Regions:
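Basic, glycine/lysine-rich polyanion-binding surfaces/domains
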Residues: 1-156
Length: 156
């Protein structure tokens, strides 16, 4: 199979966890409150991924995003967590990337109407995002080697 896996360089990664009572207020400041929304920057990189109810993953946040997070915390909407080291960022590409992932879940169906999702791929907790002809994945770091081994096995 033609599938390439590349572990991306470590970068700053934050999560924002909204207090249940504050989710409605986030809508007023233009945060998507529907899980599955993926905000992408002009260069195509992920900016804010709403991967589960009340939870957002923010890979390598720029100054503007950091300011938005600080404002959310200051307004009492939730907490910002530095989760550097929690996730291993992986890029899965090639004509058979979807087929490899389909051996664990129907990734096309999961991401059909959403920009991102919290899923379990090969029993590894993952935040998945479709990116044109490839997948950007944030695999729980303690599972990354197991994930890479599963992809390697299926890519042969």
């Amino acid at each position: 199979m033609a599938c390439r896996l590349a572990r991306l360089p470590e970068a700053s990664v934050w999560e924002f966890v909204a207090y249940p009572s504050a989710v409605r207020n986030l809508r007023a400041v233009a945060w998507s409150t529907a899980p599955g929304a993926a905000e992408i920057s002009a260069d195509g990189s992920p900016r804010r991924l709403h991967y589960a109810p009340g939870r957002w993953l923010l890979p390598d946040p720029d100054r503007d995003m950091q300011d938005q997070l600080d404002a959310g915390v200051a307004s009492g909407f939730g907490v910002r967590l530095d989760v550097e080291g929690k996730w291993a960022a992986i890029l899965l590409s090639g004509p058979d990337a979807r087929r490899v992932l389909a051996s664990t879940i129907d990734i096309a169906a999961v991401l059909a109407n959403r920009g991102c999702a919290a899923v379990s791929l090969f029993d590894c907790p993952t935040v998945a995002m479709r990116d044109v002809d490839r997948y950007r994945l944030w695999v729980a770091a303690s599972y990354a080697e197991s994930f890479e081994a599963a992809v390697d096995r299926l890519s042969r």
